[in-house]
């Protein structure tokens, strides 16, 4: 087999493997509607230790929130589209949950710590809901928590010199009071779907 042909076939194989992985990661649970709880391969670990600063400039760790249900989302305040949409979805879902929503602590963790200081995070998240807590930190701290939650993010600087953006994955993580992943939701999940799934999970915990 000639070298160019081998390279082409190798490239096709890589694309097929990646496509299969994406399809597995984003497939819904049996019986679920579009965007509802994503099923992960058995043994997949998401979540873990972190050391960050909240939007009131207080140091926090994963232990700060132990005993609480968490709704975690990663993004940044300069995000033009998916972040504000998702935060609004989270806020609306909490409203739909009524009193049950009080059991949830929503966390918005930045992937752009250079611009997202505690005060910037506070102003931003409270536009959506006063219950949402913004978390930031230094580059190493953000890299650590992103790795624990398997979050992809990368800085993208336009050639025209305009402000940079952050490319990042967009999933909502429901973590149980012991810090374990209870459910994972994709970016197309509606507030109604999110509220229903959370209500079901919390009901199972009783």
Language-model regions, residue ranges each:
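C-terminal alpha-helix
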Residues: 197-205
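Short active-site neighborhood of thiol/selenol oxidoreductases, capturing the structured segment around
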Residues: 62-86, 90
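Structural microenvironment flanking redox-active thiols in thiol-disulfide oxidoreductases
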Residues: 85-145
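N-terminal targeting signals for export/organelle localization
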Residues: 1-49, 205-206
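Hydrophobic beta-strand anchors of alpha/beta hydrolase catalytic cores
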Residues: 71-72, 106, 172
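A short beta-strand-turn-helix
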Residues: 50-70, 94
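Short, small/polar residue-rich loop motifs at catalytic or cofactor-binding pockets
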Residues: 45-47, 69, 167-169
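Thiol/disulfide oxidoreductase modules built on the thioredoxin-like
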Residues: 141-197
């Amino acid at each position: 087999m000639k070298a160019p042909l081998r390279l082409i076939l190798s490239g096709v194989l890589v694309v097929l493997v990646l496509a299969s992985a994406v399809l597995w990661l984003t497939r819904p649970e049996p019986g679920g509607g579009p965007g509802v709880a994503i099923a992960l391969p058995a043994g997949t670990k998401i979540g873990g230790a972190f050391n960050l600063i909240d939007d009131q400039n207080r140091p926090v760790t994963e232990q700060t929130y132990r005993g609480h249900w968490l709704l975690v989302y990663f993004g940044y305040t300069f995000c033009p589209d998916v972040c504000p949409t998702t935060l609004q979805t989270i806020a609306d879902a909490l409203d739909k949950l009524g009193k049950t929503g009080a059991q949830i602590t929503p966390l918005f963790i930045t992937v752009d710590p250079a611009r997202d200081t505690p005060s910037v995070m506070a102003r931003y998240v409270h536009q959506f809901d006063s219950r949402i807590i913004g978390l930031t930190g230094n580059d190493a701290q953000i890299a650590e928590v992103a790795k624990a939650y398997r979050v992809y993010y990368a800085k993208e600087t336009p050639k025209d010199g305009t402000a940079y953006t952050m490319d990042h994955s967009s999933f909502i993580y429901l973590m149980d009071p012991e810090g374990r992943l209870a459910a994972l939701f994709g970016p197309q999940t509606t507030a109604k779907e999110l509220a229903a799934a959370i209500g079901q999970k919390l009901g199972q915990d009783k």
